[in-house]
Amino acid sequence: SQKHIYAIGDLIKGYQLAHAASAHGIHVVETIMNKQPSLVRQEDITRCIYTRLEAASVGLSEAQAKEAGYDVKVTQSAFQGNAKALIKGENEGFIKLVVDKKYGEVLGAFIVGPHATDIIGELLSVKASEGTIHELSQIIQPHPALLEAIGESADAFFDSAIHM
């Protein structure tokens, strides 16, 4: 309530994550310096869990998307069919996408599996730029790579996934 007092991190409503606090801190510094502050959108902050089997998500869940009025299709691919996961012996888990049926916009993404907290960045980029499932399915990923599982999940939207 005071113009000259700012709060970030665990003091504010939202995700209590280091990368969220850092983004808010940069926003505050830019505001104080009279620069155009970076936009910090809560829905574009990744949620990451650093456990043996990592988990990460960004955006809306299926339930949240439906509650917001979207007609959604949920796709999923498993790491069991991913060459890199098989080579590394880390083939547990999946990638799940929540997609708006009408426009193909990627509304949310959920990953449980190897390096999920690294992979989520690509899905954040697509979501934050309002990318479509069609664009995501057209990306030619390196092979072998865990990122190929993203393409598989995108291809599942069109019933054209081949490694499932």
Regions found by a protein language model. Name each.
Residues 20-24, 41, 115, 128:
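Short acidic-hydrophobic sequence patches enriched in Asp/Glu that either
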Residues 50-164:
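Flexible, glycine-rich terminal cap/loop adjacent to redox cofactors
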Residues 2, 41-43, 101-102:
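Short, flexible turn/loop "capping" segments at secondary-structure junctions
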Residues 23-26, 30, 47, 60-67:
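Internal, well-ordered alpha-helical scaffold/interface segments
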Residues 9-13, 46, 138:
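Short amphipathic alpha-helical segments at helix-loop
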Residues 1-34:
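FAD-site-proximal beta/loop scaffold in flavoenzymes
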Residues 1, 45, 91-93:
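A generic structural signal for well-ordered coil/turn residues at beta-strand boundaries
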Residues 31-58, 142:
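Active-site-proximal substrate-binding core of FAD-dependent oxidoreductases
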